[in-house]
Regions:
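Short, Lys/Arg-enriched N-terminal segments with co-localized hydrophobic residues
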Residues: 1-10
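Alpha-helical phosphate/pyrophosphate-handling elements in metalloenzyme active cores
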Residues: 16-34
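Juxtamembrane helix-capping/reentrant segments at transmembrane boundaries
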Residues: 61-82
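Helix-coil boundary and interhelical linker segments in multi-pass alpha-helical membrane proteins
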Residues: 29-40, 90-100
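Hydrophobic alpha-helical transmembrane segments and immediately flanking/interface helices
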Residues: 92-122
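Juxtamembrane/interfacial segments flanking transmembrane helices
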Residues: 56, 115-134
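Alpha-helical transmembrane segments of multi-pass membrane proteins
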Residues: 43-54, 79-87, 107-115
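Conserved small/polar residues in nucleotide/adenosyl-binding loops
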Residues: 146-148
Length: 148
């Protein structure tokens, strides 16, 4: 039985280190993005939906490509990098509110939402006019949030 106890202790140490790594990563991401508020959660959902609907649209058009898919993922990653940069500008340079971060998040919410609607149209799904209007309005008004 002593061998088993030694293995359990090693495994517990590994688990502890993994927990610390995830806690550190979560802390960094929370700091970098300015916390995970409703806007950021919505952006995550919109980005995932846009990628998924884009893959569906490409499959229907028989245009699936791993290269195009990789570029799409790279663009999605850059969206979140820009949100983080906007948050750093707000918190470290302007030191006043979250106007830049919010404007960047709204900009990409509108872009990703409109892209989902375009993908839905390619798939053959009718798109509600009110939804199109709301996303277009959000895209137009994104910069009005910035009061520097």
């Amino acid at each position: 039985m002593p061998k088993r106890a030694g293995k359990d202790k090693i495994m517990q140490n590994v688990i502890d280190k993994i927990e610390w790594m995830f806690a550190g990563l979560g802390g960094f991401l929370g700091w970098f993005f300015g916390g995970f508020d409703g806007f950021l959660y919505a952006l995550v959902v919109f980005v995932v939906c846009d990628y998924f609907t884009g893959v569906l649209a490409a499959a229907i058009k028989h245009e699936l490509s791993s290269e195009v898919g990789f570029k799409g993922i790279a663009k999605k990653v850059c969206i979140f990098v820009l949100v983080g940069i906007a948050n750093i500008i707000d918190t470290q340079i302007l030191q006043n509110g979250a106007a830049i971060r919010t404007a960047v998040v709204f900009f990409y919410l509108a872009n990703e939402g409109l892209s989902c609607l375009e993908n839905a149209a390619v798939i053959g799904l009718p798109v509600p006019d009110k939804l199109k209007e709301m996303l277009a309005q959000l895209k137009e008004e994104k910069l009005s949030l910035i009061h520097i």
